Amino acid sequence: MEKYHVLEMIGEGSFGRVYKGRKKYSAQVVALKFIPKLGRSEKELRNLQREIEIMRGLWHPNIVHMLDSFETDKEVVVVTDYAEGELFQILEDDGKLPEDQVQAIAAQLVSALYYLHSHRILHRDMKPQNILLAKGGGIKLCDFGFARAMSTNTMVLTSIKGTPLYMSPELVEERPYDHTADLWSVGCILYELAVGTPPFYTTSIFQLVSLILKDPVRWPSTISSCFKNFLQGLLTKDPRQRLSWPDLLHHPFIAGRVTIITEPAGSDLGTPFTSRLPPELQVLKDEQAHRLAPKGNQSRILRQACKLMAEEAKQKEDQNAGSALEQEDGLCKVTPSTAPVPGLKATPQESSLLAGILASEMKNNWEDWGAGEAPRTSRENHINLECEQGFPEPRPEAMGRQSTDVVDPENEEPDSDDEWQRLLETSEPGPVQLKSPLTLLCNPDFCQRIQSQLRGTGEQILKGVLDGVSHLLPVLRILSSLLSSCNDSVLLYSFCQEAGLPELPLSLLRYSQESSSIQQQPWYGALLRDLVAVVQAYFSCTFNLERSQTGDSLQVFQEAASLFLDLLGKLLAQSDDSEQTFRRDSLMCFAVLCEAVDGNSWAVSKAFYSSLLTTQRAVLDGLLHGLTVPQLPFHTPPGAPQVSQPLREQSEDVPGAISSALAAMCTAPVGLPSCWDAKEQVSWHLANQLTEDSSQLRPSLISGLRHHVLCLHLLKVLYACCYISERLCHILGQEPLALESLLMLVQGKVKVADWEESTEVALYLLSLLVFRLQDLPSGMEKLGSEVATLFTHSHVVSLVNAAACLLGQLGQQGVTFDLQPREWIAAAAHALSAPAEVRLTPPYSCGFYDGLLILLLQLLMQVQGKPGLIRDVVGSEVWTILWHRFSMALRLPEEVSAQEDDLLLSSPSSLEPDWTLISPQGMAALLSLAMAIFTQESQLCLSHLSQHGSVLMLTLKHLLSPSFLHHLSQAPQGPEFLPVVVLSVCKLLCFPFALDVDADLLVGVLADLRASEVVVCLLQVCCHHLSLLQAELPIGLLTRLALTDSASLKQFVNTVATSSRAIISFLSVVLLSDQPLMISDLLSLLTHTARILSPSHLSFIQELLSGSDESYRPLRSLLGHSENTVRVRAYGLLGHLLQHSMALRGALQSQSGLLNLLLLGLGDKDPAVRRSASFAVGNAAYQAGPLGPALAAAVPSMTQLLGDAQDGIRRNAASALGNLGPEGLGKELLKCQVPQRLLEMACGDPQPTVKEAALIALRSLQQESCIHQVLVSLGASEKLALLSLGNQLLPNSSNRPASVRHCRKLIQLLRPTHST
């Protein structure tokens, strides 16, 4: 503080006090912000430090510059530029500003925000109070208490910061948001500067949320079209469509006026918000937004408001019963009797509680939001006047809720309509779940009064007493609101039981339809509509779903559905059209009922839809009849009398409701497969009706395809019926009017209410027709270019994918369409990176992206032989986006790199893939696409594969995991495509081993595969999911991995040793199969195991060779196999096992014919077999024990092999004969002149290794006295001495063969002194 003079206080708030000051020894005027530490939590102090750190690094002419900051014992002091005033003050004094001044301020605000967003900083509290006036008329943005600098890993935020008047829709709904929330706030500020009031203004937080989410902005005529367009862009409710960077800079309203401050960015800053995200990051952002999206539908803002309301109500309840209760909100004072509950006069405290609840909604708690500013009281009348003059008053009921009239509950009639109307307003549901209805339901007196009023009046009506029906109508409306707005299933269902719901409204409906006296009453239509509204709201309650069943609610729901169907069937059977509105409302209620049934179990759906074909057939027949009955003309012929618009709309209501009901009955909802089978029954019935030649249903339905209201629903009906009826597809393929309507719809020549969704259904329907017919219906051959245009130019992702689906089918039928690679690559990138909105199940059980993947595969096949284009695809963003989107569809678990405030994220509990996005068929297409690319650009693709943690490698490994394969085997068409998926993955993983790759790259690939235990996955998939013929490639890959990586080999051995008998049985079947390549791979794997690992790991190999009955049938089959490669590897395996296995030696002795098979290999025509066999016999002879005598038969064959042309065979034969010497076979060896042959080899064989083997054998054999004598008689010492001398004459001792040592030792052993 010694640096500054404190002059005067210029402001005060919840944060502390602001003083005007001057820096000592200078004329610089500053603002000093004193923030007390006392009473602040650690989190608040951290946030303060964050604000200081953010401000410290900001240098911009339109942002307040922090000059200094320091701490005292009790306070934190922040020193900033001194501003001349606040923009808020100008609004207070002048009301609004001329547009040219607003334009200047807009350019400066945009400049400041551009600077912040380019540094990945969100302000999060943009409002007039945070905009200061600088010298010369400029503005400066201040107050960064809620600002957030986002890391490169954080794409969206979820914490609620800011002031409600300027909050964006995504903020008030507590959805994830990004920098576009700041841009919405700028739009609100500029609107307020120009008009005098914010675009959404009310004193009720609940109404404010509703306005922000649902109401359009009201545009006064005083603003220019350019300014209006600018504000419309900023105030777009969908943040994805909101005007943002960089387009914002180029808008004519501010173009050329914005100051851009550029400065070097840090290397770790990441992508600035002012640049468009690369598509792969856009995919990650969408995924992060999806994960961060709130699970419920309650807003944190409104939960806080309701909490405050409840606390206030409780405080009022504790006050004296007779005292008046004042609630000051800056506008009015409300007494406890402002909103009394009808008939609640038991105690003043109870009345006070409910009155407080109702009055609290009118109380303005602005100090709890944002920085704590209250509404500007002095401007209140001005704002109201401005709204009244500029716009029509939209909500008279809102004004009524702010009434200052005092009502005396003692003198008011208990059941007045005004009281019920106030309760109705309190219980009305907003766009998000409010707590007021929940608070009402928690009050037993309110519930009792509602229930008694409903039962009392309802039972009177059922008894024919019609007085007081008018009191029933507001009660019914309150019930509708409560049922629609409360999410507490237990509480709500208990209330319904006590109130007699839904039995009483259904009984009243039935009685009203049957009573002629009621039908004569003026309120008859209103009563029917309100009763249906209650029933509809009841059907939409969550306690009707099996997954959230409360008590016997599911049974009650089914009974109520049956009663309603009875009433609906009778209603549809009537020819009286006097109550068209009631008929329409009943049909819409039926559509809601279908949605509720679809969300239930298979049993509930089956029973409901089956009843429409049996006991409730009247409903279905009535709907079909209603569709064929001639209605008022939809299009007035030329010269005919014009029909008034209200009458026209009324005439369209019932046909629209009928078509909507039919669509609800047969359309399979996305992601709810439990009801598909049940709905197929209805679709079959409709399809049969449509295929009858005499039926009027098909012409009526087809003619409705060109009607702007009916089109979408009737398209869904046709699509559902064609989905299961091939006959209907053939009929429609020959129906000119139907095809013409579909083609005109795709071409945009039919004006319909929901063109995008209708076109999507039409595209899928045409795809289905081509697929079913395997031919092109008339006129479709010219459709290619128009569908291609939709594919490349539409911004609606669902349309792009539907167009891709149809293009794929057209391409298979030979239709040509001109798609340039640059266009289809860009279209694919857009379709894959934008959020997926699946509204309809694509044809033939496909996923949302299947059609796109199949089309991409077709397009890629067309450019085979053009490596440059393939390289462009792999190098483009679409390749990366493709695998990111696929991994999202697979729901790969991954760690969350950042958390938003205290929000803890977890990976999805279920790893089942999202089959609505990509089906097994789509996965097969994607992997085929990857194979085609890998084949032509192997090295480029390997770089993607070898990156540690790459999405491509993670995805491929996941496709082999047991959990995924289990889900795949249970999916529709999963068993059919499972082998295709597995084999495609294996082919892709084989590439690193089939190519000449860098050693480091291969090490990285092996480490990835080892970490995921791919060897284990391959073994399990072969054992549990593939046929023997399909297992060849996985076994080959498994073998390659185990031979290359010792850790993978151990994984294989441990899996076999610890798993069930299934794996041993599978391997045994392989060894006995007629698949020589697979047998050879397995034998190589087993041989490598026997060579590398200790004998304790080899028991399973012994088990495999002996067979289940220990007859050694597998080993016999292998040794006698017709394929040379199999015999070579079988003898090699046997040779390695005989080094350790005593059991195998015993089997050679005890098993009849087994030793003979071993010895037969010594005379095999194939040299490789002879070499392996001689190796095996040599190991069998080593320490043969009891087997030794039996090996005498091998001596002649082995002696003959000493003269083999293959040096390896000669070496093995010499070693084997040397091993037989100590086994007492001297006579047999002498008989075959083995000593002489070995001596000749030792002295004259051209190969040093063979000489060495012969010398070692002679050293072993000379231990037998008879052989020793023969060697002496042959002059072996002299011959060997000459050999030794020749080796000594070599110039370099390092080049002398190892046989020299053996030669000297043997000479020493043959000396007479040694022999004696």
Swiss-Prot record:
Q: Where is the composition biased (Acidic residues)?
A: 407-418
Question: Where in the body, by tissue, does this protein show up?
Answer: Weakly expressed in the heart and thymus, present at moderate to high levels in the lungs, pancreas, and kidneys and at higher levels in the brain and cerebellum. Very highly expressed in the testis.
Query: What SMART domains does the record tag this protein with?
Result: S_TKc
State the deletion phenotype: Mice display profound growth retardation with a communicating form of hydrocephalus, nasal inflammation and early mortality.
> What cofactor does this one take?
Mg(2+)
Q: Where is the active site?
A: D125
PROSITE patterns from the UniProt entry: PROTEIN_KINASE_ATP, PROTEIN_KINASE_DOM, PROTEIN_KINASE_ST
Pfam families reported for this sequence: HEAT_2, Pkinase
> Which Gene Ontology MF annotations are present?
ATP binding; metal ion binding; protein serine kinase activity; protein serine/threonine kinase activity; transcription corepressor binding
Q: Per its UniProt entry, what is the enzyme's top EC class, as one word?
A: transferase
Where is the protein found, in the record's own terms? Cytoplasm; Nucleus; Cytoplasm, Cytoskeleton, Cilium axoneme
Cross-referenced SUPFAM superfamilies = ARM repeat, Protein kinase-like (PK-like)
PANTHER family noted in UniProt: PROTEIN KINASE RELATED, SERINE_THREONINE-PROTEIN KINASE 36
What job does the chain carry out? Answer: Serine/threonine protein kinase which plays an important role in the sonic hedgehog (Shh) pathway by regulating the activity of GLI transcription factors. Controls the activity of the transcriptional regulators GLI1, GLI2 and GLI3 by opposing the effect of SUFU and promoting their nuclear localization. GLI2 requires an additional function of STK36 to become transcriptionally active, but the enzyme does not need to possess an active kinase catalytic site for this to occur. Required for postnatal development, possibly by regulating the homeostasis of cerebral spinal fluid or ciliary function.
Belongs to which family? Answer: Belongs to the protein kinase superfamily. Ser/Thr protein kinase family.
Q: What is this protein called?
A: Serine/threonine-protein kinase 36
Q: Which gene encodes it?
A: Stk36
